[in-house]
């Protein structure tokens, strides 16, 4: 990639229909794990006008009121009024869970290559990434896109901008100079609002746009990056119909929002609703943990990790490191350090990151990475000093 370029990432709020689905799926996972942390869970959710459908495969000893979990999640997000197209009290919730296939379970319970370990729950490839663009070691565009919609929800819930409704999307276009963030070229923020805020694009009140820029955007984005920045606020002019009424929501349909905003490849597997025997989730978390510790150790300014698995096999097919020329030692040497200091077998990942806990609801909105939450063990940099010493730095 050229040293001077524009790069864009987007995020969506907790009220976006796909994120509603993700949050319900992870709330169900947490409710199950609170009783039985060895459950096998693949909880999928569909949301539409006045309707929630829960489906997937669950094998558990837990006794969970799935319908109530779904309603509680919708309430917490803020869909508490029939005018919003879905409300927690009156929406229909359909439940259609099966048990995990025994064909899959036998390969997960005992790995074909390591009888003392668990096998991967599926084949697949996963990526982790870290870079020095922000203190959280995340790419700046996705990091700030998350913070914008997070602030939208905060101001909606605390009543400072009472005309806001739950659905919102943000997009940040960053200008890079010499390969580093220089300024923000464009900010797009579309937020659902009450009907009285605008009737047509030409009648949109200036006070609405001003409130979004002054109360949401400017408090979040670094002022030194706001140089001739273009602001596009509700570009269609009206955003009253939103959430599951505006679009059908599905679990796992915001995988780029959930990860790095397109700054690195994605293996295609979603996270929400999946227990950590599913390497789509746990190995992606582990790959982030590895990449973040490599950058924190000063071994590279940016680091991409790829791991891949075969179903029923414990050991990854490959561990590949790519630092895009920023590494202080060869990528192959960093990969050897990773293999020596991180157990990337499924059971090893679960133990290393303490994943058999009801910690997943927090991950389901505003990004799985780059957030200093105590539950997010994959954000620790506790291996940085060890890696640095092992590299001889």
Swiss-Prot record:
Primary subcellular site in the record, as a coarse category: cytoplasm
Entry note: cofactor: Binds 2 divalent ions per subunit. Binds 1 potassium ion per subunit.
Biochemical pathway: Amino-acid biosynthesis; S-adenosyl-L-methionine biosynthesis; S-adenosyl-L-methionine from L-methionine: step 1/1
Region (Flexible loop): 100-110
Cellular compartments annotated: Cytoplasm
Enzyme class: transferase
Domain of life: Bacteria
GO cellular component, one term: cytoplasm
One Gene Ontology molecular-function label: methionine adenosyltransferase activity
One GO term (biological process): one-carbon metabolic process
Entry cofactors: Mg(2+); K(+)
Subunit structure: Homotetramer; dimer of dimers.
UniProt protein name: S-adenosylmethionine synthase
Gene: metK
């Amino acid at each position: 990639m050229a040293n001077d370029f524009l790069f864009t990432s987007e995020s969506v709020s907790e009220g976006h229909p796909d994120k509603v689905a993700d949050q319900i799926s992870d709330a169900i996972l947490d409710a199950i794990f609170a009783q039985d942390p060895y459950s096998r869970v693949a909880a999928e959710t569909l949301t539409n006008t006045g309707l929630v459908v829960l489906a997937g495969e669950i094998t558990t000893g837990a006794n969970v009121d799935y319908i109530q979990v779904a309603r509680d999640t919708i309430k917490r997000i803020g869909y508490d009024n029939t005018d919003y197209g879905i409300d927690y009290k009156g929406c229909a919730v359909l439940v259609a869970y099966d048990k995990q296939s025994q064909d899959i379970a036998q390969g997960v319970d005992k790995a074909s290559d390591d009888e003392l370990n668990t096998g991967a729950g599926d084949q697949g490839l996963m990526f982790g990434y870290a870079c020095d663009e922000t203190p959280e070691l995340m790419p700046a565009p996705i990091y700030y896109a998350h913070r914008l919609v997070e602030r939208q929800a905060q101001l909606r819930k605390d009543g400072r901008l009472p005309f806001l409704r739950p659905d919102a999307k943000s997009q940040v276009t960053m200008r890079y100079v010499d390969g580093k963030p220089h300024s923000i070229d464009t900010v797009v923020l579309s937020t659902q609002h009450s009907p009285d805020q605008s009737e047509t694009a030409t009648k949109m009140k200036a006070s609405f746009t001003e409130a979004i820029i002054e109360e949401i955007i400017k408090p979040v984005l670094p002022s030194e990056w706001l140089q001739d920045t273009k602001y596009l606020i509700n570009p269609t002019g009206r955003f009253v119909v939103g959430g599951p009424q505006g679009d059908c929501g599905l679990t796992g349909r915001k995988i780029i929002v959930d990860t790095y905003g397109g700054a690195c490849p994605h293996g295609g597997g979603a996270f929400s609703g999946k227990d950590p025997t599913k390497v789509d989730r746990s190995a992606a978390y582990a790959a982030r943990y590895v990449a973040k510790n490599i950058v924190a150790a000063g071994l590279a300014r940016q680091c991409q990790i790829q791991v891949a698995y075969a179903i029923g096999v414990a050991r990854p097919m490959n561990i590949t490191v790519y630092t895009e020329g920023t590494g202080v030692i060869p990528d192959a040497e960093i990969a050897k350090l990773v293999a020596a200091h991180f157990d990337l077998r499924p059971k090893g990942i679960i133990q290393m990151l303490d994943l058999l806990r009801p910690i997943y609801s927090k991950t389901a909105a505003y990004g799985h990475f780059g957030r200093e939450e105590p539950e997010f063990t994959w954000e620790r940099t506790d291996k940085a000093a060890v890696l640095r010493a092992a590299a001889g730095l």
